[in-house]
Amino acid sequence: MEQQPSVPRSCTNVARETPMNLNIQSTTGTRYELSVPPDETVDGLKRRISQRLKVPKERLTLLHRETRLSSGKLQDLGISDGSRLTLLPSVEAGLMSQMSRPEQSVMQALESLTETQVNDFLSGRSPLTLALRVGDHMMFVQLQLAAQQSGASHLQHRHVITRGAEAGASPQYRTLHTSTSALSHLASCTPGSTPPTTLSPTASTHRDGPHSSPLTTSVFRSHGEGVAVSPCAEQVPCSSRGTEGTSSSASSRSRKPGAIIESFVNHAPGVFSGTFSGTLHPHCQDSAGRPRRDIGTILQILNDLLSATRHYQGMPPSLTTLRCHTQCASQARNPKATSPQSSEPQQTTHPVGHCQAQTRTCKPSGDRLRQTENRATRCKVERLQLLMHQKRLRRKARRDSRAPYHWMPTRKSSRTSSNSSTSSGEGSLEIDFEDSLWKPDVKAELNSEFVVA
């Protein structure tokens, strides 16, 4: 007798977990059914409808029994299984809708993504392409997160952790399979011919802080890992950069959530590419430290990347400059890794001298670009100074025109400044109009009428 009440309880639990079927009917005649969980909210229902209709959810209006649904849970509003909802289209016209669309373009694009697209992007299987319009400019942004690495890359990552621990970093790291600490980059290259000893012995990896943990599936890369990136097509081994001071400062910064732009390449006018690394914010992670598979995680990554542009120091190098530095670093590192300890010093100094010669050839391009920008800035400053000087002269002429004229030098200077400021054809401020307009035999009482003109 005591087991009978447990049967309806299990039935009610199953009934609560079963989704509700809602009949959506629009005013244009479209009808379809939509299955939602029992604890679905109005905002979530609008998001599901917007994903199906490819319409922003801000332009959707739902009615239930002639009552507009704005917020709250569906069960609290009296909506149950089999309820009928009316969908009203929101029509906008004029310039107001065009001005408000750019502010909501990113959020609308993220909300239109399906769960499969979000999972593929966060796991690194597919890139995320966004078309943004700022004023009259159209920008195409493509983000690619590196996929989860395994095998040799896992061993390589573990070797970096070991060498970083020998350099004095904290030994508390997370493995690659549970929650990675070495978060990978956009274009990763695998050094196949170089031994593991060519990696930087002073590279320190990410420390696990109490409030932040790195993103799973290698979405970002560790702040302290000082490894430069080279394209895989060139087959150039990854070169190490950074010293003990920079690695220790980077490891201290890596505890804070956020992103850091590590490389930035200018391929052509208006075409840029680069790599970034960082740590995901704690509110985008679940209780196990894994990232949440929703658009909030993508939005947080975009915000971190945008805020990282303010802290990015240095001018974006060109593609040839980056390749030159990569080749120089690889040539300077290979003799040290292959030559024995008793090798002659001439063999190690020759590639370094060759590297310096290559860097000298790479410097003029950056210096020429810097000189061009300095010249353009100087021209702008001189133009602004000229405009300010002309404005100052016009203000002085306007002020002198309303003042009484008791002295001859004041009257002559005011007329000269007014004539020089109003003349637009000459463009010179040193023209003397006294010889053509002023005659010494004219009386001063008659001049007071046409001096101001």
Curated annotation (Swiss-Prot):
Residues 185-219, 231-256, 330-374, 390-434 are annotated as: Disordered. Keywords: Cytoplasm, Nucleus. One of its GO terms (cellular component) is cytosol. Pfam families: ubiquitin (PF00240). PROSITE patterns: UBIQUITIN_2 (PS50053). Residues 390-399 have a biased composition (Basic residues). It comes from the Eukaryota. SUPFAM superfamilies: Ubiquitin-like (SSF54236). InterPro entries: Midnolin, Ubiquitin-like_dom, Ubiquitin-like_domsf. The keyword Nucleotidyltransferase does not apply. It is found in: Nucleus; Cytoplasm, Cytosol; Nucleus, Nucleolus. Residues 20-94 form the Ubiquitin-like domain. Residues 330-362 have a biased composition (Polar residues). Residues 188-204, 239-252, 415-428 have a biased composition (Low complexity). Residues 365-374 have a biased composition (Basic and acidic residues). Its main location: nucleus. Disulfide bonds: none annotated. Facilitates ubiquitin-independent proteasomal degradation of polycomb protein CBX4. Plays a role in inhibiting the activity of glucokinase GCK and both glucose-induced and basal insulin secretion. This is Midnolin. The lineage of its organism: Eukaryota, Metazoa, Chordata, Craniata, Vertebrata. The gene is midn.
